[in-house]
């Protein structure tokens, strides 16, 4: 039987806005308001052993650090999860789940390391955690590649596998195509998740489509308070929770979410606004990594038409894997072919010189009279 669930990832994805420095009081406020709102799953941040522990930040080197921040807070019936970007947190930094405040680990990974990442997920599962296999940049997968990943995931049998639209590229038809590939081929016990970004202003409508799609399994969507998140932002949780209350009979307390937004989120928005803008539209419309757009815009020498021309020349396999040297080469090539003035300069050298024009009575020795004489010529 289908179940629909809501996952909040404000303290993790929202951290891209403020380098995860929410401040301890805000961390507690956001956590407690979301628990009171009744969210099903709450993601409390990144586990990243390259970072040192800071109680004011939601990026932590170990699960024990997460325990220090959240351990005394009542999580009620909500599942508490953290995220690992595969390769940034060694398995030794995870305590057994039975000794941790955290219930589940979401592991994000790119296509080229999916075999290694799934093996890491097996190790996480052995520690007793609920595991979420998060396939980032889902649009980089062909159908065959995605089905190969599904085979690996079926063998893992995680709590969930998620479609991660990292750069907000998906429209309804291709989103549902990916969803159906998973729905028809994943074991029924594995939930399907969807993580959206708002580059095309489609996070809300796409999430509604995923929730409405027939499925005999659990389907969950990610959202954040006021859409706080990387680049164009995420699905606003206050919108999708209202929709889920109306259509699916859920009972999320939206007022608690609005309180958290007012108290803890709006100060960050006023300082560093997120949301749809032209920059993220250009990256999404060209199906490319936003750093390519940023690189070209920072040159301050190109029109939007020229930027689109260069982005269109990026090879498909390079589009979502940012390569600074590669885009520099494309930029220089464009400049040399489209903006090369050498031919025009040579043409000017070949032009017949214009005859020297001299006033009828010669050039005056007085400078002011000279200017006057020149004006008379025109």
What are the functions of these language-model segments?
Residues 1-378:
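Catalytic cores and adjacent flexible loops of soluble metabolic enzymes
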